[in-house]
Amino acid sequence: MIVYLDNSSTTKQYDEVTKIMLKCMQDEYGNPSSLHSMGFASEKIIKKSREQVSEALSRSGLCASGEGYLFFNSGGTESDNTAIMGAAKARRRYGNKLITSEAEHPAVLESFKRLEEEGFEISLIGIDENCRIDMDQLKSEINEKTILISLMKVNNETGTIQPVLEAAEQKKNALFHTDAVQAFCRVPQSVHKADMISISSHKIHGPKGVGALWIKKGINIKPLILGGGQENKFRSGTENVPAIAGFGIAAEKASGGMAEKMKRVAGVRKYLLEGIKKEIEDIRVNSPDYSCYEKNQENGMPLCSPSILNISFLGTRGEVILHSLEQEGIFVSTGAACSSNKKTKSHVLAAMGLSEKESEGAIRFSLSEGNTIEEMDRVVYNLKKAVDRFRKLGSLR
């Protein structure tokens, strides 16, 4: 039996998701833009999924029901790109300053880099040793020329929950976008001040290749993909009906009983962390110790997602530990899957002040509602063996 602890990279689809997708592929395959009954049937499926995902956003505390419009696209990366580049270009006549943090997902940072090449002024907000943004710096950077602020809700490498509600309250006349890919259906906390919210299906046990961008009513952005004007003209191209249907089912199921499910995940995460601390010496915990479902919170504020735990095993290489665990049927990550195949250290851990050696030994364990205490015993046992073996070999060099 495998132990899958790479749920921040992707998740296993719910069986109900696969079932509805198969039905759409076999029976409900009409083009939703067609004027016949098969087209209407597909359009109805999209409408229902939009309602399901919108309701899940509301349950997650990310937006209030009825405040905006949600349109489907290919995933979190496209959502981030569209929000950032679309908003910046639509509001350029009001200013040219854009603000984000050093710890964002590459989909955000690369969008900002492209806009900088096009003449926009970019400000990067620093983070502390817990990966939390410097609020004082953010406040000082916002001025009358600021047209967009983009800050993620939950960091995908450390699980740190950013104070986005507090940050959004400082926005003045700027638009505020949050990448909520790792928060959706996992961390219930209000970001009602956000103007745009990016989410993804495959992080919540839905299909890959589909995501959504929620936009508050009255906000106009320039679409990146032009054509037939689908998705209320925000995202042209024939909709991926099976994936959208699967996304709707996944959002409905993942958001149902979310608090109780995530409390269980938090308990498993805590058990794993305590086991590692007890059995393995010379580690650095890169995630805040306590999740948003535990009592020990800083000033009453949640610190970390219950799903993510990032630890550096000093004197080792994360990639070697990863493959050692893989041989035992345990699957973890050394960082974000979007960039973990590159031979560069994590930009997030570097911004937190970790040395190259500390970053090199980092492992990310990301849990889901299906992980168990018994699995964590197996993980700790095999992890200790792998770390001890590597350190012993290293000392013989």
Please identify what each model-predicted range represents.
Residues 1-397:
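Pyridoxal 5′-phosphate
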